[in-house]
Amino acid sequence: MWLSLLAGPWRLVNGLLATRVELRKAERALTSGANKEARLATLKGSAAAEQARGAFEAPAPLLDLAMVSAQVRDALPEMGHVVNAVEHSAQAARSTLRIGQNALKGPYKLIDQDPDDPDSKKIRIERLVAVGELISEVRRAVQSVEDELTAVDAMALPRSLRDGIARSIEKARSTDRTLSDAEDGFAILPDVLGGNGRRIYFLAIQNSAELRGTGGSLLQFQLMQFENGRPRLLKERSGSIYKIDQDRRQLSIPLPEDAWYVAGIDDAKRAGNANWSPDWPLSARLTVAYSEAGARASGAPWPAVDGVIGVDPEVLKRLLPGIGRPGAGTDFKLTPANIVDYVLYKAYASFPIPGIRRQRLSYLVDGFYESLFNPAHPTELIPGLGRALSEKHMQIWLERPNEQKFIEKMNWDGGIEDAPGSDYLYIVEQNVGGNKLDYFDEQTNSMNIRLKGRDALVSTEVRIYNGALAPLPRYVYGNSGPLHRPMINLYAQGDAELIGAHMVKGRRLEASPTAELAAWNGNHPPEHFELGKKVWSTTLEIPPQEDAAVRFDYRVPGVVRKVGDHSVYRLTVQHQPKVRPETLEVRLQLPPGAGGVVAPGWTRSGDTLMWARPLVKDMILEVKWRG
């Protein structure tokens, strides 16, 4: 009799707990690419959800008896919402499993042999559409989970369960936001891949041993065509940027107001040197405009370009585990640990004759990007691609506004952030020595911040170390011998006011790249506005194994905000992708009487907060206090 009384409640509780455990297992298994384990856990979770539903709806004498208690009587009606939420979670898991199992393998996979060219791959547009529909199905199930849990009267539940309901609601909302991004991405992807007409993209290959605003000098390019999901590198029209910039010819095109560097530097008026602004959309549009102008000037045909994708050698490192080892035209064994060094340095020593070196590197790069659509380990490709995008080693500009809107939403655009209600820092280095010494460059940015009322008084020091060991080959030294000549550009909020700038150590140049862009007026360096930001610039000259440093002192008005009973200081930091990530050190002096300080990620010593680490991603730092 007692077993009969206990059976109903036990099946209900056991079903709910088992569903949660198994669906968590399924999530972890799918994330790691373990599809068999994910399938088993999903089936178990679905069965457990059915068990919970059956137990909830079946007669249960013990539950009837427990209804005498007011606490149980109040809580039990809420269990219907919980059981509904569990069933919707299982439904979402089943649909997610279908995506995970079918996207990369089997008859429904996204990438398959091209029936018109058995040696090539094709992205199946109809399967992209089907996966997009499945994502929408998953999202609807997740939204139903949120709806059911939000309908629960948490106060009717035991206190021990309330936090779990709140966490589950937040998890559902977070998942819904992620699925919204995926839904938007799959909505534009068929068009981006040529499902409704041919698309051509300009793959801008940047050399980060010679820095430009977006991450490196644009020395090589590929035109990549997509037609109905079929990718093809247009090799005969790709290669050295000097196929476009014949004789480094400088061209005249209408320049936007924010193209300050290009307007002031004659050699920047061409496709391969127009990326001085760190804002990828601006630099990408200039690159396309100069490419078109160069084609017109030479009478050569040039296709309508639908977007520009910027990449640097770090992309090879991030994607190599998924792609597999490409041929390099050498016995040198390429791995994620050495491929960047090979491309930027060791290949120069292995092939000192420029023509042979370019041929070998071109062979490597062609093979690499062709393998993107026939990867050896597809499940390892996605996380590598995500990391390359988040670290700005890959940046995207698409010509169509609706597609670019999605890229911006995902923060894949490499654009200068608006950062409203926030202090702002972006240190951008340009190589004006015509060399490859940024391969040895180490940069440390140190901010000291003192808050005065609603304003921030900031001192930012930029220190560059030239780690080159002389002597080095001519192809590394370039035009300036062993002397490293980095142009430093500090981007601050548009209403920031410069108090003064000072050389802390070393030598600065007054006429490099030009006097207008480098010469100081007293203790004020050149200043310009760019995309809502104020920028101060100077150029250093640094011998091997030495460093140089410059400090900018400025005031940022109105940057401390009041939110409820807290004062809030927020700092938006953007980073320039480099071979060796810059280090950021921040010291913030708390106002007198500050209490209840909330400063995630900071360490505290007395009234000073400190934050220091290598900067590989754009980020936001925030401090809250009372008083």
Range-by-range predicted roles:
Residues 8-217, 221-223, 358, 378-417:
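Non-catalytic accessory/assembly modules
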Residues 220-222, 307, 487:
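Conserved beta-strand and immediately adjacent loop positions that scaffold enzyme active sites
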